[in-house]
Swiss-Prot record:
Its EC number is 2.8.1.13. Interacts with TusE. Residues 97-99 are annotated as: Interaction with target base in tRNA. Transmembrane segments: none annotated. It comes from the Bacteria. Keywords: ATP-binding, Cytoplasm, Disulfide bond, Nucleotide-binding, RNA-binding, Transferase, tRNA processing, tRNA-binding. ATP binds at residues 11-18, 37, 127. GO terms for molecular function: ATP binding; tRNA binding; tRNA-uridine 2-sulfurtransferase activity. InterPro entries: MnmA-like, MnmA-like_C, MnmA-like_central, MnmA-like_central_sf, Rossmann-like_a/b/a_fold. Residues 149-151, 311-312 are annotated as: Interaction with tRNA. It catalyses: S-sulfanyl-L-cysteinyl-[protein] + uridine(34) in tRNA + AH2 + ATP = 2-thiouridine(34) in tRNA + L-cysteinyl-[protein] + A + AMP + diphosphate + H(+). This is tRNA-specific 2-thiouridylase MnmA. It is found in: Cytoplasm.
Amino acid sequence: MSESPKKVIVGMSGGVDSSVSAWLLQQQGYQVEGLFMKNWEEDDGEEYCTAAADLADAQAVCDKLGIELHTVNFAAEYWDNVFELFLEEYKAGRTPNPDILCNKEIKFKAFLEFAAEDLGADYIATGHYVRRADVDGKSRLLRGLDGNKDQSYFLYTLGHEQIAQSLFPVGELEKPQVRKIAEDLGLITAKKKDSTGICFIGERKFREFLGRYLPAQPGKIITVDGDEIGQHQGLMYHTLGQRKGLGIGGTKEGTEDPWYVVDKDVENNILVVAQGHEHPRLMSVGLIAQQLHWVDREPFSGTLRCTVKTRYRQTDIPCTVKALDDERIEVIFDEPVAAVTPGQSAVFYNGEVCLGGGIIEQRLPLPV
């Protein structure tokens, strides 16, 4: 007697990647069902209300593919485990990455548990551009085949056990192929543009959105030489290496080079700026990271040669990683790197394999 097909619950976002993932899994012989997660409660009459449109698109795709679509509300989990932490980080003058937190707490925790326990799933699947491979009996996380779309940076907190229960069908394809499949199938999501903005909160005006939850405190903008040259509307609206939105031009005596944020003095509510994107104050020789997650879940000790990304879409930087203690590591880059930002994630790679990462606690500035 043949075994019954394994059951996969696909996280349907209403986008093209999850739509095509569901179809690919059907082709591979899985019993496929969809799940739409509502993770944010919109205010009534909110103009950015995309959740209803996304749900309608997800439903249309599931109808077309002949699969059931479940819905679940994780808004409370999102608020408690992602959003409150996100606000705390901003309050402390750091720049968090909510997508990483959301993957850790919602998609690969709340969703994974709900799919297994309530829906009887053998696996979950998402439309992430990553791959998995089994090495020495443990599931490893690999970069997506499409280097331009690879999303392993956002999934470094996953352990091998979570990866073993997750399928990533589009990780083996390039984005144009995914769009072509959706077009050939006549899916409503074929030409839908990729979502940007904060995970699940969508493309709302960020400044206005943040201002609802955190009181903005205007303060001085000073240069690295100590001259006051303007006012900022709130430190939380600025991040290291930022050039746009400072509202200052070149100075009378100085060059016309654009200004960049090089530091945030949280205690005194001062934004520090310098001219030129390779200003020494913007460069770091390394970083200290904490809140470490290694995919193989083995504690790290000693030293390691690998590459690191300190933000998404960055070219890999060769580096040496040294364990300081169980909780923290020191990372020294082979060459100085601009705009290393506390609160963001440092993610480590050995070739195609994502090893894990941690949160940047501090950057190690160029010796003056």
